[in-house]
Amino acid sequence: MGLPWYRVHTVVLNDPGRLIAVHLMHTALVAGWAGSMALYELAVFDPSDPVLNPMWRQGMYVMPFMARIGVTDSWGGWSITGESVSNPGFWSFEGVALAHIGLSGLLFLAAVWHWVYWDLELFRDPRTGNPALDLPKIFGIHLVLAGLLCFGFGAFHVTGAWGPGIWVSDAYGITGKVQPVAPTWGPEGFNPFNPSGVASHHIAAGILGFIAGIFHIAVRPPQRLYRALRMGNIETVLSSSIAAVFFAAFITTGTMWYGSATTPIELFGPTRYQWDSGYFQQEIERRVENSLNEGLSLSEAWSRIPDKLAFYDYVGNNPAKGGLFRAGPMNKGDGIAEAWLGHPVFQDKEGRELTVRRMPAFFETFPVILVDKDGIIRADIPFRRAESKYSVEQVGVTVSFYGGKLNGQTYTDAPTVKKYARKAQLGEVLEFDRTTLESDGVFRSSPRGWYTFGHANFALLFFLGHLWHGSRTLFRDVFSGIGAEVTEQVEFGAFQKLGDRSTKKQGAV
């Protein structure tokens, strides 16, 4: 037949049986990949430290998606929250992975069956015997099924009526766990950080989809609309389906990059804007201030700060810091976090408290500058010592630690002070193991960054695909001309089965 590689999908253009077959095979590949990827991630995942070495630092991609809808335990006896588990049941990480692989095998067999038995009576008009599909009715059936699935997820899985619930956490990603969520029907349901909206919106969207599906099954489209939108052409279905997919990809790109309601920071890592806005830094300062007001010492106040919160306040966990083309998990960059060393407070010889200006997300390198409470530069690590006026040695800077591993310790020697000033530029001071994974010191992005980049690109490609196929179906008569023999040739080809010379039609051009 000699079709070029970019035209091979013509084979299923007017062949519903094999169109079903290739979709089944595609779904088999997707399910098989998901299950296999989950098993691979489980093989390399280290569950020993959920606070400083969580799944997003290790580069896990499919595990966070399982965890956010209630799968948190392993047959290995561990949970991502750090507890030991004695009886996780079938719906563990391994169980979900094997279920996907089993589903993939069944879908493969179904694809083979539909490829072999492609010419079913179901695809023929009983009155004429000609191949015919009632595409508006098929659209309605799909809407009904999608609506039922959507409603079921919101009404049963999320609410815990028949399912585990979803991952719910506080605003700072400290206390997250899987729990049932009750739907909310007031304006608070539209708060993008309110998990109750997940339940209510799925219930509402499911009901709407079901009603819309019944409508499209029962009510025929007007003839003019049917013709104007080419509702009888399978390429119209392709075009509108691509539109639905690229729209969903754009939406989830935004919710992944900017939001954390359905993509919790405990599972996917912090967002870029939490670093840019000093989100965790402000919360830490608020907690310390409250503790001081209660009469605690500075050391006691900082010792109350959870390691988890301090760990978030570190630029290396910012997904925008990693660069798009540096392969590997975050741990391959700065290393495996082992401990929070504490909060460093710098002082000059005149007793002024100094703060290291933090590195913005955009910069790879940034000068180490220490400023006082009024924002005036009092010390730095100079590029050229010959012209230096504010060097650590000249200003006599010391550093004291509060909270963490170095709580209560003070350093006065300049090399040590400069070492911690460089670390403080990146946020809270942490200790990393760089040897185990041979980490190279170059920041990596988190799965949040990978997902966003991938789906933004796919959404753009699918948008162009929607325009292409939409144009083809709307202007098909312009492209191919009009006439009985041309329609026969373009629509159905010279063969009953495209490319199969044994099924040559009589009277075809």
UniProtKB/Swiss-Prot annotation:
Gene Ontology terms, MF aspect: chlorophyll binding; electron transporter, transferring electrons within the cyclic electron transport pathway of photosynthesis activity
One Gene Ontology biological process: photosynthetic electron transport in photosystem II
Cofactor note: Binds multiple chlorophylls. PSII binds additional chlorophylls, carotenoids and specific lipids.
Keywords from the UniProt entry: Chlorophyll, Chloroplast, Chromophore, Membrane, Photosynthesis, Photosystem II, Plastid, Thylakoid, Transmembrane, Transmembrane helix
Membrane topology, from the record: Multi-pass membrane protein
Membrane spanning residue stretches: 21-36, 101-115, 140-156, 203-218, 237-252, 457-472
Keyword Hydrolase: no
Domain of life: Eukaryota
Family: Belongs to the PsbB/PsbC family. PsbB subfamily.
Descriptive protein name: Photosystem II CP47 reaction center protein
